[in-house]
Amino acid sequence: DCASGPCCRDCKFLEEGTICNMARGDDMDDYCNGKTCDCPRNPHKWPAP
């Protein structure tokens, strides 16, 4: 399925919902979608305090 990338392991796409980028600051975690080797950016942010 894939050769390399944050959502690729052993030439297979990682399962949908696998965290591929941990949250930093007000960002939320990014998750693999099970269809691409890239790590899709989560557009959502944590609400301001």
Swiss-Prot record:
GO CC terms in record: extracellular region
Misc. remarks from the entry: The disintegrin belongs to the short disintegrin subfamily.
Tissues in which the protein is found: Expressed by the venom gland.
Keywords: Cell adhesion impairing toxin, Disulfide bond, Hemostasis impairing toxin, Platelet aggregation inhibiting toxin, Secreted, Toxin
Official protein name in the record: Disintegrin pyramidin-B
Keyword Secreted in annotation: yes
Stated family: Belongs to the venom metalloproteinase (M12B) family. P-II subfamily. P-IIa sub-subfamily.
Residue ranges constituting the Disintegrin domain according to the UniProt record: 1-47
Known role: Inhibits ADP-induced human platelet aggregation.
GO molecular function: toxin activity
Subunit structure: Monomer (disintegrin).
PROSITE patterns membership: DISINTEGRIN_1, DISINTEGRIN_2
InterPro entries to which the protein is assigned, alphabetical: Disintegrin_CS (IPR018358), Disintegrin_dom (IPR001762), Disintegrin_dom_sf (IPR036436)
Entry superkingdom: Eukaryota
Motif (Cell attachment site) on chain: 24-26
